[in-house]
Regions:
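Extracytoplasmic small-molecule ligand-binding "clamshell" domains
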Residues: 50-54, 62-95
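Secondary-structure end/capping motifs
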Residues: 226-296
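Beta->alpha turn/N-cap motifs
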Residues: 76-78, 87-100, 163-164, 181-187
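Pocket-lining segment of extracytoplasmic ligand-binding domains
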Residues: 165-256
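Bilobed "Venus flytrap"/periplasmic-binding protein-like clamshell domains
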Residues: 38-60, 120-177, 182-184, 288-292
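Hydrophobic/proline-rich hinge and linker segments of small-molecule sensing/allosteric domains
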Residues: 108-129, 206-223
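A structural signal for short loop-to-beta-strand junctions that line the ligand-binding cleft
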Residues: 41-42, 104-113, 136
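A local structural motif
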Residues: 63-73, 153-166, 303-309
């Protein structure tokens, strides 16, 4: 029977220690390699001027995007809501309402669109919402926050889904009786001699004792990105928004390419309405407003299930 000498035993211990140390070094180097790899991601946002404004510094290469190589997917909000359900994009803008129908998503703290005592409105040739229950209303999508706000405020209505930009003219041409309008149309509807008959922003402000109106949010798929990557992208988006606010004229110029022939003055006004302090950082009030929206939808039997709301931090 062979015996291991104390010298051999010491060698085995030293060899094992060296092997552990070498494995540790390799893992550290591999981790560094992985962390330095370029990660290609698809990021969805709408063609609305406020969304374009937020992404100006990122899309123009004016700030570092870290290890992310970003492909911008620019589509209507309802299309982005539907893409989110299928996890087609790593990061995307969605309606706050749409979050209730998603799973495995985290809400970013930056990039949200919140109204401050203003928001979607209902327009018509009529002077009031009297008898609206028997009328047809054009809506920009059944998963939009505007539609959820209207449903909470006014109950179940006869609605027709339309491209949001077509709604004002549809009212003008008597294709629908009322129109639920979002985006720049909130400012330009009066050019068509149409009437504002219900202001959902004012209604929300009064109903919730002054919470901001939760409209659009940015989410990241936790199926496609890990928590560190989500936090990192959140920081990049926040840096972009801050840069753009500090370079307002240049960022507005960039936004005009998505402006749908809207004047620069209107675009600037709309951007300054919806790119605000809550866009840079959602803060506790922004989070409270999202929770309140979901809570009110449940109490009105619009949402049937509990919704777990997760934030990047």
């Amino acid at each position: 029977m062979s015996m291991i000498s104390s010298k051999d035993h010491k060698f085995i211990i030293n060899y094992n220690a060296f092997e552990i140390f070498l494995t540790f070094i390799i893992n550290i180097r591999l981790l560094g390699f992985v962390n330095n790899m370029v990660l290609k991601i698809k990021v969805g946002h709408t063609p609305d001027s406020d969304d374009a404004f937020m992404f100006y510094a990122i899309e123009s290469g004016l700030i570092s995007t870290g290890n992310f190589e970003i492909e911008h997917i620019v589509e209507d909000i309802e299309n982005l809501n539907k893409k989110a359900i299928k996890h087609e994009l790593e990061v995307t803008a969605i309606s706050a309402h749409a979050y209730a129908y998603l799973s495995d998503y985290v809400i970013l703290n930056s990039g949200g669109s919140f109204g401050i005592n203003y928001g979607p409105i209902i327009i018509s040739k009529k002077d009031s919402i009297n008898n609206i229950q028997n009328a047809f209303i054009g809506i920009p999508g059944s998963m939009t926050s505007a539609y959820l706000l209207m449903s909470i405020a006014l109950g179940k209505l006869h609605c027709k889904e339309m491209l949001f930009s077509d709604i004002p003219n549809a009212v003008l041409n008597d294709e629908i009786d009322y129109g639920l309008i979002i985006h720049e149309s909130q400012i330009t509807y009066s050019d068509l001699k149409l009437n504002k008959v219900f202001d959902l922003g004012h209604w929300w402000n009064k109903t919730t004792a002054g919470l901001p109106v939760p409209l659009g949010i940015n989410v990241a798929s936790s199926k496609l990105l890990n928590s560190d990557q989500i936090v990192e992208f959140d920081k990049i988006l926040r840096e972009s928004i801050r840069y753009n606010i500090n370079h307002l004229e240049d960022a507005v110029d960039f936004s005009t390419k998505y402006g749908r022939n809207t004047s620069r003055n209107i675009l600037t006004k709309f951007i300054q309405m919806y790119v605000n302090d809550y866009t840079v950082e959602m803060q506790s009030q922004g989070k409270k407003s999202i929770s309140k929206l979901i809570e009110m939808a449940k109490s009105n039997n619009i949402l049937k299930k509990d919704v777990e709301i997760k934030y990047s931090y």
